[in-house]
Amino acid sequence: MSSKPSDILDEVTLYAHYGLSVAKKLGMNMVDAFRAAFSVNDDIRQVYYRDKGISHAKAGRYSQAVMLLEQVYDADAFDVDVALHLGIAYVKTGAVDRGTELLERSLADAPDNVKVATVLGLTYVQVQKYDLAVPLLIKVAEANPINFNVRFRLGVALDNLGRFDEAIDSFKIALGLRPNEGKVHRAIAFSYEQMGRHEEALPHFKKANELDEGASV
């Protein structure tokens, strides 16, 4: 079976990546260096695939990230960064259950890792596991109080659990970070409505509509 062009390119990039370092260490000329690089060992290949896969995930190239990170993920020799970015890539490419499992294991392995907790908490909101999302996002919000997305999604989770006063508090903090976000005003209004506080909901509905109309002009 012939290799895909992208596979061949990655191989050539891998060999080129290490060609110069081989030449410097062994005093080879460039022809000899590239010849040596084509016999690159598995450890170097693993490092390259790991770094390249994580880079793909960070850049939003999730399918490419999955292809590379699956080759270096080892459940027995657990690497939190590999598991985190492979988990993100799985979620983004539709393999939500597999991604969530990896993120949960990542948090179990690194319970104080705020980035892992953030990603897992937001994933729980996405899959509507609000009871699991709330404690994680509260912890993350305390560690990173100016993260708009965390504050907003925490409000969404609280609202869906019927904890409307707490949801409004979280939405208002998010609104302080981004005053002109129409979706936050609308979320506050809906939370007020669900408590029967129509007069308090009305100005937020109006503001949301104004912002939406302004954005469409």
UniProtKB/Swiss-Prot annotation:
Where does this protein chiefly localize?
A: membrane
How this chain sits in the membrane, per its record, is:
Peripheral membrane protein
InterPro entries, sorted = TPR-like_helical_dom_sf, TPR_rpt, Ycf3
What residue spans carry the region label N-terminal domain (NTD)?
Answer: 41-112
Residues with site note (Salt bridge that stabilizes NTD): R50, D79
* Any GO BP annotation: magnetosome assembly
- Write down the superkingdom of origin: Bacteria
Which Pfam families does the record match to this protein? Answer: TPR_16, TPR_19, TPR_8
Cellular component, GO annotation: magnetosome; magnetosome membrane
Q: Which SUPFAM superfamilies match?
A: TPR-like (SSF48452)
- Keyword Iron-sulfur recorded: no
Fill in the misc note.
Answer: This bacteria makes up to 20 cubo-octahedral magnetosomes of about 45 nm in diameter which contain membrane-bound crystals of magnetite (Fe(3)O(4)).
Q: What does this protein do?
A: Probably forms a large homooligomer on which other magnetosome subunits assemble. Required for formation of functional magnetosomes from pre-existing vesicles, it has a dynamic location in the cell.
Q: What is this protein called?
A: Magnetosome protein MamA
